[in-house]
Amino acid sequence: MRMDKLTSRFQQALADAQSLAVGRDHNIIEPVHVLAALLDQSGGSTRPLLSQAGVNVPLLRERLGEALDTLPKVSGQEGNLSIGNDLNRLLNQTDKLAQQHGDAFIASEWFVLAAADDASPLGVALRAAGGDKKKIEAAIDKLRGGETVQSENAEEQRQALEKYTIDLTARAESGKLDPVIGRDEEIRRTIQVLQRRTKNNPVLIGEPGVGKTAIVEGLAQRIINGEVPEGLRGKRVLSLDMGALIAGAKFRGEFEERLKAVLSDLSKNEGQIILFIDELHTMVGAGKADGAMDAGNMLKPALARGELHCIGATTLDEYRKYIEKDAALERRFQKVFVGEPTVEDTIAILRGLKERYAVHHGVEITDPAIVAAATLSNRYITDRQLPDKAIDLMDEAASRIRMEIDSKPEELDRLERRLIQLKIQREMLKKEKDDASRQRLADLETDIDKLEREFYDLNELWKSEKAALQGTTKVKEQIEHAKLELEAAQRRQDYAKMSEIQYGVLPQLEKQMALANEVEHHDFKLVQDRVTAEEIAEVVSRWTGIPVNKMLEGERDKLLRMEDELHHRVVGQNEAIKVVSDAVRRSRAGLSDPNRPSGSFLFLGPTGVGKTELCKALADFLFDSTEAMIRIDMSEFMEKHSVARLIGAPPGYVGYEEGGYLTEAVRRRPYSLILLDEVEKAHPDVFNILLQVLDDGRLTDGQGRTVDFRNTVIVMTSNLGSHQIQELSGDDSAEAYTQMKAAVMGVVQAHFRPEFINRLDDIVVFHPLDKAQIKSIARIQLQGLEKRLAERGLKLDLDDAALEVLGSVGFDPVYGARPLKRAIQSQVENPLAQQILSGQYLSGDSVRVRADGGRLVFTKD
């Protein structure tokens, strides 16, 4: 017999049989070796063939093992391996059967058929396991589907649907799919398209996360439950696994061969299978090589002839990018648009899924948590779609509660660490012999005993609480399983089983659940098993950095005392601080307009009066870090072409992929303070971009993505009108301030357009600084120097007279507080640096700074 006339699978089986014989020290290859090798082949057709023919495969394996054990062993004869007479005879019979059926290559199933009525030990083992020649022959006919073997790889192309698709109807039947709530209109539209005579291939198009795949799963569930028109009853929905189809296709044409086998199997089923291709755009260009056809082109004839009943799913962008370009492929599909569900629909979807997630995590998900997940995700997570983002919120919040249940509570952990510390101290004190150490040891023993009792009580409490929670989890799982069995019995119309579950098993389990709930108190001290709205808000805060969780008492007090906190860093400017504080309080109390930024201000005033410093202080107050402020120097945007840098370059320009300077910063940190410094120096076109930010709290970047500015505070600073402020300064009365503000506003209105000024929440005019305020600023600025000296082990001591000197030297009504910084450098830092370097001051010394005749004198204390 020519080996090249065997299929590749059969050749591989003979090679494996030879290897098996060598491993068992057999010098003759027998038929049992070959069948054992065929059964062990991964992805082979022998096992499913025998199972279909009613053969008990585990028993057959057992009998084959016994037959192999009875074969004689010969050691030291590994090179003298030969084919036995029984195997030779069987192979000839196999060749004969293949020729009778018109096969060009000999397939492994004819070997199994030849063995069925053979007198060899293999035939005996096969018949003992239930092998019958007629049944095996019928199974072969079903497996081959009337086709002959015309290629070496023919066996590998069999059962293509089992290998390269996932049966969604089977998953729905076994209860592995999540329930699909709502989406009735889209499912009805999909069924409507599937029922058409031609072009009966719907393609579901929608944004990522709106539930396109869920619609197909919903269709599979409806088919299983018989809730579909007559034309779709009994059909199967198979999902094409593109990964399995491409994986391992090493040679050119292998991918096409697999896809052809899938299409061939589908045509054999004569419309009884609906193929679901998720991410349909991957078919365009898949398997494409030089001059080769891609998968999309291979699908076209089958779609046109109606042999392929297909549902596609893809996103809007990818449909436009890949499918619309191929008009011949596009016309064979009928578009079904899947929109984002409303918040109310999302709440209904979450209520349907709640039970599955609660059972998986072993926690209780409350209804307020579901409402919070839908509303908060819609309000704060703007770059993703409902219901996906709301489901993720619920899932992560439940996961967090589960993790807290499984891990040791913080209180218990702290006690354990304290005990370890005390025990280490006890071991050290045992080595000491003096009376004081013995006394300390006795005190320590008392403390350890007390802590150990406390730890034991808490540990027992934790274990009992945890056990109570686990009890309810098991009952919930049993209820879920019983409901799935009830649905399966309903489909089979097994009324006896339905009655048993509905009136026996389920009431019993619900009674157990009620008892478990009585034991389980929700006011547990250490563990909490309920997901509430607070947990959902906590997850949103972690995702976005926006503080949407319930305010703690400490934070409320801090917000009420906000003006005092800001005055620690900004001297004077009461009006500006009040305006900014009110805006932040409105936002945190949830009273500000949800479709506009939390606050938008224009700070006006001469240089050095604290405009930028107030922004830094505000960022520090809100985010505990001045780094959280997005600072953009508007003098960088003086030219017209530089405006695009704020939102990103348009398509076709260099830097398109990088995104915008402003938009990318806000996308990464949606809760932030944006400082547009020296705004009057920017090109007028910048203000056109800012109009929609100030009005609608949104901005579209160069890539077409909408960036949310609703949680930002926007502050613009400007020196416009500083000349008028200087002229009218000196009078602290309210009338003088009103007159000054009117003069400044005249300059502002002449420079900025009315539509820009009209969109701002407030325009604040900063007061020029007086001598007393400069002295207070000097005290604040010297705190930084004191901190730096403290790192070197030195202490700084300045009296009021020295501060007066610094204030008078650093006071300049035109330049504000900036000359003060230079005065501190020249009067304090420079002489002090020289004296430290010369060794006059060492670590631990105190530096006294005193005034003497208008100059500062340094002495060591």
From Swiss-Prot:
Biological process (GO), any one: protein refolding
- Residues holding ATP 2: G605, P606, T607, G608, V609, G610, K611, T612
UniProt keyword terms in alphabetical order = ATP-binding, Chaperone, Coiled coil, Cytoplasm, Nucleotide-binding, Repeat, Stress response
Annotated segments matching region NBD1? 159-340
Renumbered to this chain, region (Repeat 2) spans 83-146
Ligase among keywords: no
What's in the GO CC field? cytoplasm
Location in the cell reads: Cytoplasm
Which stretches does the entry tag as region Repeat 1? Answer: 6-71
Mostly located where? Answer: cytoplasm
Kindly state the subunit structure of this protein.
Answer: Homohexamer. The oligomerization is ATP-dependent.
What note about domains is in the entry? The Clp repeat (R) domain probably functions as a substrate-discriminating domain, recruiting aggregated proteins to the ClpB hexamer and/or stabilizing bound proteins. The NBD2 domain is responsible for oligomerization, whereas the NBD1 domain stabilizes the hexamer probably in an ATP-dependent manner. The movement of the coiled-coil domain is essential for ClpB ability to rescue proteins from an aggregated state, probably by pulling apart large aggregated proteins, which are bound between the coiled-coils motifs of adjacent ClpB subunits in the functional hexamer.
Q: What is this protein called?
A: Chaperone protein ClpB
